[in-house]
Amino acid sequence: MIIIRAMGGLGNQLQQYALYKKLESMGKDVRMDISWFRNADTQSKLLKKRDLELDYFTGISYRTAESEEIRGVLGRLWEEKESVVSKVGRKLFPSSTPYFTESDMYHEQVFGFTDKYLVGYWACEKYYADILGKLRGEMRFPRSEDAELEDKNEAAMHRMEETESVSVHIRRGDYLEGANYALYSDICTEAYYEAAISFLRDKFPSARFFFFSDDIPYVREHYRSDDYEMIDWNHGRDSFYDMMLMSRCRHNICANSTFSFWGARLNAHEPKIMIRPSLHRNNQVCDPERMKALWRGWTLITPQGKVLR
């Protein structure tokens, strides 16, 4: 049995689910461990509390791992789960431990596992690129119970369908706090967004840009144009409707955020242009050729505004 730990925000959860469905499509016996969201100690260490959001979607289905099944895969490590001994053992003897922790952009070996507990975010699209069509069919957004919100989103989707629409995601918020600042800042720079917008304007002079952000006042101050529109009404639990609206745009400019990666992945328009930063974190080594191989179909742009071709 393969058990995948579900953790993190909505974008990360969707990636873990996507890997689950890929392994399931290969005939593997797979489960999702959702206990991370109930762990008070884990949640207390986060800048922002996370909830299990997979179930917001109407078409998603998965089997959850019971405690006995987790214990069966982890064996004696179940008792020492996060002890120093178990952590050192996993690093020194990775093949002998039932744990497998993501440590690179892509691990081909995950497809050969039979009994493993997988810990990671699995952002690389190569893991599940061939089943994205199926995933789009499963990741269906429900109608909002708020009639006014539903009407606003419906009207926005209509405008997106009628124009050469481009979603632009600018994430600030928790990326400017604590340790996150060193990890995520200065990647999606003004030069990055200027290059991305210019790239699409050159191809589509009539393009209309729809901005999504957790800091709309900043966006209003820095991005002003007659062909810009701010989407600023989906808040709290309803924030995931921003992903729905991103997916209805014809093209997508993403932040270094799995949330907007999924907005682009769920975009069913063809042809389409998906733009993402050339790296996700500042501690990531950026090999342009490898990134292009792992993210086929995407346009990569550096923090300096260089388009990688």
Question: Across the structure, where does each feature detected by a protein language model lie?
Answer:
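Short hydrophobic beta-strand segments
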Residues: 1-6, 31-32, 116-119, 162-174, ...
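Short, aromatic/basic amphipathic alpha-helical patches
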Residues: 42-57, 219-227, 287-294
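Donor-binding and catalytic core of enzymes assembling or modifying cell-surface/extracellular glycoconjugates
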Residues: 10, 194, 198-285, 290
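Secretory-pathway luminal glycosyltransferase catalytic domains
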Residues: 45-199, 203-204, 302-304, 309
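N-terminal pre-catalytic "stem/leader" segment of glycosyltransferase-like enzymes
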Residues: 1-44
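Aromatic-acidic/polar surface patches that form glycan- and anion
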Residues: 5-13, 185-189, 238, 256
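Leloir-type glycosyltransferase catalytic cores
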Residues: 282-309
